[in-house]
């Protein structure tokens, strides 16, 4: 009898744990909503005028866009190549870009855009590239 009660309790605990755990796709959706409602409105960085997130659930991918007031030219492109990775590292350190999602296989495509919405710099964050950003 005691063995049966223990077995039933163990099964119930396992079910509760599984129900309460969120899968990666749910975390991805939750992050995008949180980013757009909480992080983006108060986000401040030099030359950044707007930032948004988009989630692509079927591809396990999140796109972060940083619109700037910079013109598209070689000088700004060169500066973006240096400053943008630093900004991303800072965001990872502040958990504004969550390591856990990247480690679970979510890819972050991060765009630094000129004032005409052309790409000044693009970084792709994966489990492998995350190591480079954290150096």
Write out the residue ranges for each language-model feature.
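Short edge beta-strands and adjacent turn/loop segments
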Residues: 45-70
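Post-signal peptide N-terminal segment of mature Sec-exported envelope proteins
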Residues: 30-51
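Bacterial N-terminal signal peptides that target proteins for export
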Residues: 1-9
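Short, non-transmembrane amphipathic alpha-helical segments
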Residues: 36, 74-101
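A short amphipathic beta-strand at an alpha->beta junction
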Residues: 91-120
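C-terminal partner/receptor-binding element of secreted or periplasmic proteins
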Residues: 112-135
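C-terminal motif of bacterial Sec signal peptides marking the signal peptidase cleavage site
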Residues: 17-20
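Bacterial signal peptide processing site
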Residues: 22-24
């Amino acid at each position: 009898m005691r063995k049966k009660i223990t077995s039933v309790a163990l099964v119930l605990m396992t079910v509760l744990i599984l129900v309460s755990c969120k899968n990666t796709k749910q975390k991805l959706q939750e992050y995008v909503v949180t980013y757009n409602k909480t992080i983006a409105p108060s986000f401040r960085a030099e030359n950044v005028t707007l930032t948004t997130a988009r989630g692509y659930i079927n591809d396990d991918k999140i796109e972060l866009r940083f619109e700037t007031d910079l013109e598209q030219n070689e000088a700004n492109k060169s500066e973006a190549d240096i400053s943008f990775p630093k900004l991303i590292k800072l965001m990872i350190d502040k958990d504004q870009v969550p390591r856990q999602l990247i480690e679970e296989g979510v890819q972050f495509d991060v765009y630094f855009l000129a004032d005409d919405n052309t790409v000044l710099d693009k970084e792709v964050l994966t489990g492998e590239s995350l190591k480079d950003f954290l150096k």
